[in-house]
Structure formats: C-alpha cells, structure tokens
C-alpha cells in the first residue's frame, strides 16, 4: 500500500474518534501516504493527528472538474468510515483497487469491493473500536481494548497565537462548553451558570466556549464576575484547540470540544445520558484524564431506549467534586 485515503466527512467528535484507526494504519503501513478526506472545518483537528500526511476538503474535491477529481483520487485504497454516496461512486470510477465500506449501506453494494459486516447501533464497543472493523480487509484483524485505544493516541497541538485578552495562567482555568449544536443531550444552562459562579468564587478562571450562535443562547445568563469570561464566537478552531490544550479542565456534554480536551491530555469531563447509542460506553472521550458523569448508571428509562432527561439531574456539587 502506497497511498491510503480515509474518508470521515462528519463532525469534530466523530473525526476525533477516528484517530486510533489512523494510527493503527500507520503502524501497519509505515511507508504509506495516509490522506484524510473531511469537511474543511475539521482540518485543524486532523492536522494534530501525527499519523496523517495530508488533508483534503471534500467540498473542494467535488468542486473540481471530474477529470481532476479522478486524477486526485489515484490511490491503492479508500476507507469510507462515514459513508458518502457521491464519494463512493467517484472512488469506484477512479478505479481505486481496494474500496472499503460497511455492508449496511445499499450503495456500497455497487461501489465497495470490501464490505465488513458490523452494526454500530447495538454494539457494546466504543466508537473508536467500531472503526477497526473497517481495517480487517487490510490485515488489522484485532479490535483493541479501550485501554489499548488510549495508548494508540498521538495528538500534537500546534502552537497558535491566542487573543491578548485570554488570561495567560492556565493552572486554574476551567472551560465550560454548554451547547452541542443539537448533537447530544445537554445539561441545563442554569446549572452551568451555577457551576461557573462557584468555580469563580473559589478562585478559578472560568471561560465559556461555543460558536457565536450558541453564545446568543446563553450569553445573557452569564454571572457578572471578573473571573468569568465569554469567548463564544471569538476563537477559530485552531485557537480553540490550543486554548483547550493549555487549560486545566473542560466540562461539556458529548461534543467535539470534550473529545479535543481528552486527546489534549487535560481533565475532560463529559456529562452523559445512559441511553444507547448516545451513552458514554460508545462516546466517552479518549485521553489519560478523560472522565464522564451520568446521573444513574441503571436508569430504567435509558435502558428502555425512551427519551430521558436524567442528565439534567446531575448535581453541580458532583461536577465540582470531580473537577477537584
């Protein structure tokens, strides 16, 4: 294998949990060129993956003339981690010899010649482990344990200049990231505000992060305190990654910044429901200091798979205790 393409064109958290399989490929094929195809906004995250040689923006690829697309897609193998119908047909047209995709997509029957049969929805495996099923056709047949997954991570944050108004001391800086763009069940905003105030009054610097749109949903609720800072809408992803890596801890639900914090090696605290398939068994962050909280490990509503708001019952005091 001289050139391997890995396609994961969804969100930051999903891309973050693709890192271990990239590292496994690097170990299996140390001389291969490994290229990641994704949404352009995830580029800064992928740049931190030491196993990846290059990043291609899928929209930029599709905007090229078809002849240029086919020329660019010259490779020995493509792995469709997140199925994309247009890319799957394009990869076949480009005559990539090994085209790997799950058997659970009808269009893969016509576009992929290697179709591992596995299901994500009802699996007990972590998302990062599930991705390894796609490596079986390449000779990586063992699914690593979650502990082994932790050891596979090689994440290197590039130094990035941060705005001058960002506090420089990081030993007492806690990041709170309340929103998730609707991708996860969220802890109540009022509890984030209570947590922020208690942390600030104990001498911590509290920074709220999120997009500008997310900031408009809670900015007016922020307690007035010298140690509580609103950064929403003010940081690029490059800056956010660097900012997180230089902080002491981060609290969020199951969303991208939680996974960035875990990979960065800081104390990452994720707030979860136990309902599958959005439970921490599937989506907890990878990292030496990554942890998670649920209200009730045995929640019956979650076990039944019904809509449950038990995450809202996680106490502020419990989160404070875990922050330490």
Language model features: what each stretch is:
Residues 1-324:
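Catalytic machinery of carbohydrate-active enzymes
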């Amino acid at each position: 294998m001289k050139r391997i393409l890995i396609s994961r064109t969804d969100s930051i958290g999903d891309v973050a949990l693709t890192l271990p399989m990239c590292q496994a490929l690097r170990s299996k094929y140390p001389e291969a060129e490994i290229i990641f195809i994704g949404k352009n906004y995830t580029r800064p995250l992928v740049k931190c993956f030491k196993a990846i040689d290059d990043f291609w923006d899928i929209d930029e690829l599709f905007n090229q003339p078809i002849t240029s697309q086919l020329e660019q897609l010259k490779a020995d193998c493509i792995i469709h981690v997140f199925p994309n119908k247009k890319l799957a047909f394009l990869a076949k047209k480009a005559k990539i010899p090994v085209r790997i995709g799950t058997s659970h997509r009808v269009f893969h029957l016509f576009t992929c010649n290697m179709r591992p049969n596995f299901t994500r929805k009802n699996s007990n495996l972590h998302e990062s482990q599930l991705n390894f099923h796609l490596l079986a056709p390449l000779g990586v047949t063992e699914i690593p344990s979650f502990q082994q997954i932790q050891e596979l991570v090689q994440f290197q944050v590039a130094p990035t200049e941060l705005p001058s108004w960002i506090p420089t001391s990081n030993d007492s800086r806690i990041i709170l990231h309340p929103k998730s763009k609707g991708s996860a069940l969220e802890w109540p905003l009022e509890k984030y505000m209570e947590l922020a105030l208690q942390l600030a009054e104990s001498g911590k610097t509290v920074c709220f992060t999120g997009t500008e749109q997310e900031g408009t949903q809670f900015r007016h609720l922020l307690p007035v305190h010298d140690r509580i800072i609103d950064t929403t809408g003010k940081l690029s992803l490059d800056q956010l990654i660097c900012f997180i890596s230089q902080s002491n801890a981060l609290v969020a639900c199951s969303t991208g910044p939680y996974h960035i914090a875990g990979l960065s090696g800081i104390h990452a605290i994720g707030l979860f429901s136990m309902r599958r398939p959005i439970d921490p068994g599937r989506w907890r962050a990878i990292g030496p200091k990554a942890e998670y909280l649920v209200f009730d490990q045995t929640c019956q509503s979650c076990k039944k798979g019904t809509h449950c708001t038990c995450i809202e019952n996680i106490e502020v005091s419990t989160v404070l205790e875990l922050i330490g």
